Regions:
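The feature marks proteins involved in alpha-glucan
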Residues: 11-29, 59-133, 138-151
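Bacterial Sec-dependent N-terminal signal peptides
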Residues: 1-15
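Conserved hydrophobic/aromatic pocket- or pore-lining residues that grip, position, or stack substrates
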Residues: 132-134, 173-175, 203
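Non-cytosolic beta-sheet module surface loops
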Residues: 31-35, 71, 177
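Short proline/glycine-enriched turn/loop motifs at strand-loop junctions of beta-rich domains
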Residues: 33-38, 135
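Catalytic domains of carbohydrate-active enzymes, especially glycoside hydrolases
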Residues: 159-181
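Aromatic- and acidic-residue-enriched carbohydrate-binding clefts of CAZyme catalytic domains
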Residues: 145-155, 185-211
Length: 211
């Protein structure tokens, strides 16, 4: 029981660290683990745009800093700065174009319907797996695919995409990196750009190039 209590305590502490931005309609709380005091900057846009506010953070424990900004900031963007340049933070879950600023969103509204109850098919043995290595863009971008959302995350929500895998006898998919990565400029998605995605910028954010 003591071991379980210790694990639960550590889990709660970890969750506290992971939540660098906690939104509610009345206020947004920013939290940062850093060796020195920093500031939070609020912007009206995910790239360029206007600086709306700079807020000094206050100490809230060892190497922990917080700032509370009153008002409804949904749809705005933020960065942290401890004197070495601006960053959306290590644990950002949503960002603007090219991942340079964190996005202030309501995380309770992000999951699709039935997200928490979705179950994968049962595989009796690893030997039964027929695995296809998939790149989001490669799999769906060809004109002959018949897919509407070519090169996007939404491509795999289309029946044709899944049926093609079934027709090939595939029952498991290994998807190449889906997180926000650096080498594709999201302001130029109509130009020829390509990478597998092993150059992460924001580990906890889906890449904007596929969004």
């Amino acid at each position: 029981m003591a071991a379980l209590s210790a694990i639960m305590f550590q889990f709660a502490q970890a969750q506290d660290v992971f939540n660098e931005m906690s939104y509610s309609p009345g206020q947004t709380v920013f939290s940062l683990n850093a060796p020195v005091k920093g500031v939070v900057r609020i912007y009206d846009s995910g790239i360029a745009g206007k600086l709306l506010k700079t807020v000094k953070m206050r100490q809230d424990g060892v190497d922990k800093w917080t700032a509370t900004v009153k008002g409804n900031l949904k749809g705005k963007f933020y960065t942290f700065d401890i004197g070495k340049g601006e960053t959306p933070g290590v644990f950002a879950k949503a960002v603007g174009v090219n991942g340079r600023r964190g996005a202030i969103i309501d995380m309770s509204q992000t999951n699709p319907d039935h997200w928490t109850t979705d179950l994968r098919p049962v595989i009796k043995s690893p030997a039964d797996l027929v695995i296809y290595e998939m790149h989001w863009r490669d799999y769906s971008v060809d004109e002959s695919s018949g897919i509407v959302n070519k090169g996007k995350f939404l491509s795999l929500t289309e029946p044709k995409a899944i049926q093609h895998l079934k027709d090939l006898g595939i029952n498991a998919v290994h998807i190449l990196p889906s997180f926000d990565y650096a080498s594709v400029d999201e302001t130029r998605l109509d130009s020829a750009q390509y990478n597998w995605g092993y150059d992460p910028v924001n580990f906890n954010v889906p890449d904007g190039g596929y969004s």
